[in-house]
Amino acid sequence: MAKKKIYSDIEFPTEIVAESKSAYGLKTYISLFSSAGVGCYGFKQEGYYCIATVELLERRLNVQKCNNKCAYNSGYICGDMTEQSTKDKIFRELDIWKHGFGVDDLDVLIATPPCQGMSVANHKKKDELKRNSLVVESILMVKSITPKFFIFENVRAFLTSVCTDLDGNDKSIREAIEANLSGLYNISYNVLNFKDYGNPSSRTRTLVIGVRKDLKEITPYDVFPDKQPEQTLRQVIGDMPSLQTMGEICPDDIYHNFRKYAPRMEAWISEIKEGQSAFDNTEISRIPHTVKDGVIVYNAQKNGDKYTRQYWDKVAPCIHTRNDIMASQNTVHPVDNRVFSIREVMRMMSVPPTFKWSEQSLEELNALSVKEKEAYLKKEEINIRHTLGEAVPTIIFKQIAHKVRKVLCRSTLSEQEIKNLIEKRNLTDAAKLIEFIKKSTTHTFAELSKIAELANAQHDNNAAYYTRQDLCFTIVSSLPIPKGQTTVNILEPSIGVGNFLPTLIRKYESATEVNIDVVDIDANSIAILKELVQKIYVPVNVHITYINDDFLLHQFDKKYDVVVGNPPYMKLTKEKKLLAQYKAEAYNKNTNNIFAFFIEKAIKIGKFVSLIVPKSLINAPEFNDTRELIGQNAIRRIIDFGEKGFKGVKIETICLQVDTVAKQSDTVVESYITDEVECHPQSYITSSEYPYWLIYRNAEFDKVADRLTFNVFKSYRDRTITKAITKPTGRIRVLKSRNIGDNTIIDIPDYDSYIDDVNNLDVAKYLNQTECVLLPNLTYNPRACFMPKGCIADGSVAILTPNENETITEQDLAFYATELFSHFYAIARNRGSRSLNIDNNSVYFFGKLKHTTL
């Protein structure tokens, strides 16, 4: 055992320390509301270490101890998740693993908060618990710990149930998850029946999986359980011995038992066949009833599956908490006159035989006398059955655990390795690239498509760049699923090598028919794509049509439900004839950048448009008309990737999602810069009050705006002064950005520049114009001063000319240097990192104080 000074009283097992230093390190998780640990036993099976497990009921936590779930006894936390003391215990365990084993980044957080108020099965729960505070506590723990993955599992109605969010407002649980976690995580929301994913019984549940956005190329789809054929009840328990005597316990398995019930009830089920209920009996005496004061009172049949004998050759029924009584749902054995035994229920919930309910081994329990077995079952059976009815099937979490480990441990090719591979195999030759893809058995689709994108000889000419799978998921997860349609028509207008296809197919695979038309101007890209498609699963209901043509000139004969993609960003300067063709149909004729033309055409032929485009769309004067056109539609979502969209490409990007059919309402802004998601009325962030969209606009921005009168300057920047024409001394000083201080000029040795003659320079018109204001051009920390006599400024400084009749004071300029204005200005510039030039749009925000007091 090793010891760490900071926790001198704690021993750190050397085998765990050794594993923590291995190539792949430890895999860890925390489980909240873990009950007996049936579900997360799947993580133990996959070799994960449980840092902490939290359960309110000690008897259930004790079951977890029987299975040696945690390395430290302190990891078993019996407590209420609404209490700070419970949370503090979790954070202490995290700290122990951080200092003892170097675990500073939790892999998985699991939360299965009690579903009180959400179950559709229990008619007695009439008053929905609006707060659902335990769900909110789960969200808060994810926010606090920020694990790589989080998993929420709950009942079917989970996402639509109401909770009081952290902001104090009532909203659906899905909205609360979105508001708090979707800035940091890619999240999939699924209501599914676990019988289709490896569980031996029917169980319709909600499964929410979040993947932290800094995990490149990993999406929730990568860790989702696999679809598998259904199993029949006969396949699951048909080999188990029949139990026909009430109270009988299988000698080889204490958990295969005939649970006793009132003998008079046997007649209610003894004559019914598979699929029949005791209420179907024709003899009145065999219909479930009670006798009160000598009067027969027949039982109510609220749930139609009470006292119902199950089918051998159908999927096993859903296991509920009261699987111990026939009056519950679907609990009667297909042949025997009894409810399912504990072991049968365990099998139906995919709980492996290695799972322990007691400190005693199965062999020890089986060796007990009959009376001792009966005493043990009397004490433990209800707890076991109830926990099984509330549990997540072990196989579901086991699959997720396996896949999480796989994606975290898989080796990926670096960009340099890909470049070396391309050079070594001469993959710039399209034929050789296609052959390489065809023969590849070890590379993922993401790796192959990245290789293909980088290898394509037309890469730079077509302005095409690889779109990571995690970014594709971010975009595709927000796309709508058309209601009431059996056929979904999708268009990818610049498909490249098909980066969006895997996520699009997964998103829409449940539709009856999916038609995906893919367009690319490059024939090589289409040929390569066809080979890449062979590497992904394409269901029979998904049809891909390849169109080798110029999207902007192609004639489409239908309206698409979704247009999604990453169009090229490039200005046409030499191909005048082609540009004229594009502009002939364009609304915005003031730009030569073809992505703007892609937006316009997509809006014409698509009901819902989702395109990755340069962030300059939001604010550049060049795209004023494009914004006007877009604003006539419902802007559903803007995802700000900043510079995180494309590695090695010095461009900021956004994803614009526009609904061309619906009415305008709210716009969601999802930011990779702030890791937050906000929602505002579209009219608020696209207000004509300002010269361009303000996607980060908020109340603090508005407070500062109320203090200023805007639109008081015109902006100018020199484009001709370079180092070649300046010198260390001279007649006229050339001011640069670092020379500009707060109402002062800063002298900087070996930095200051001069020029003798400006007569041939356009900037000469500002010489001695002392009312002009100077501002450093590219900064979020503005400061300003007036133009001194005998000076001009180079292009690193914006020269602001006050409008006629405007008087600017030093107090106005001093306000620009305040922290308050700096925050305001960051929002005014949409938190951009590159598009910070002060142009005649952005100069609008350098206003004049309405009152002179700072």
Regions found by a protein language model. Give the residues of each.
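Class I S-adenosyl-L-methionine
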Residues: 1-23, 90-106, 115-306, 375-380, 385-387, 391-406, 620-702, 722, ...
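Short, conserved SAM-binding/catalytic segment
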Residues: 65-74, 529-541
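Non-catalytic DNA-recognition/assembly elements of restriction-modification systems
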Residues: 35, 432, 443-444, 677-720, ...
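Short beta-strand element of Class I
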Residues: 50-51, 514-517
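C-terminal target-recognition/interaction regions appended to catalytic cores
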Residues: 259-413, 727-854
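Signature of N6-adenine DNA methyltransferases within the class I
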Residues: 174, 178, 188-190, 196-210, ...
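Core alpha/beta nucleotide-donor-binding catalytic domains of modification enzymes
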Residues: 7-145, 156-160, 164-170, 547, ...
